[in-house]
Amino acid sequence: MSLELYKEVLRMVLPNALLDYFDLVDVQFRAIPANERLGLESGEVIFYLDELDDFRGKEEGHTYRPNGFYEASRVKDFPLRDKRVTLIIRRRRWVDEQTGKSVGNKYSITTEGTRHTLEFAAFLKETFGYVPDRGLFT
C-alpha cells in the first residue's frame, strides 16, 4: 500500500485538515482496565502529531528560528470501533530574532472550554444537548 493511500485513510479518521498542518509521528494502543471502562470500549488509540515546520505569521523584515515545541495538548476525538481516541498534539514554537518573543501558529482544533475536537463536541452537543466531560464517549 502506498504512503498516499495511508494518508487518505488518515484524512478520513482524523479531524478535518489536521494533516495539512501536522505530521503523524506515532500511534499507540492502550488497553483500558475493566474497572475504568464506562461502556463497551476495550482500549484507546493515541495519535501523536507534531506541527510541520512552517510558521505562517511572518512579519516583513523579521527572521525566525525554531525553538522546540509548546507543551503537548491532549484532545479527545470520535471513538474508532470500541476504542477511545486521543490526539497528542505538539505545536512548534519559533523565536522572533528582532523582538526575542516566542511565536507560533494558531489553530481551531478544539471547541472553546473543552478538550474535544470541533466535530466531536458538535456531535456530543447535538446528541446530549451539552458536551459531557466524562462518559461513554469521552
Predicted regions and their residues:
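Short, positively charged, Gly/Tyr-enriched micro-motifs
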Residues: 75-138
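Intrinsic-disorder/low-complexity regions
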Residues: 22-25, 34, 66, 76, ...
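Compositionally biased, intrinsically disordered low-complexity regions enriched in proline and serine
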Residues: 7, 22, 30, 65, ...
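N-terminal juxtadomain amphipathic helix
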Residues: 43-90, 95
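Glutamate identity and glutamate-enriched acidic tracts
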Residues: 4, 8, 36, 41-44, ...
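N-terminal alpha-helical interaction blocks
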Residues: 1-55
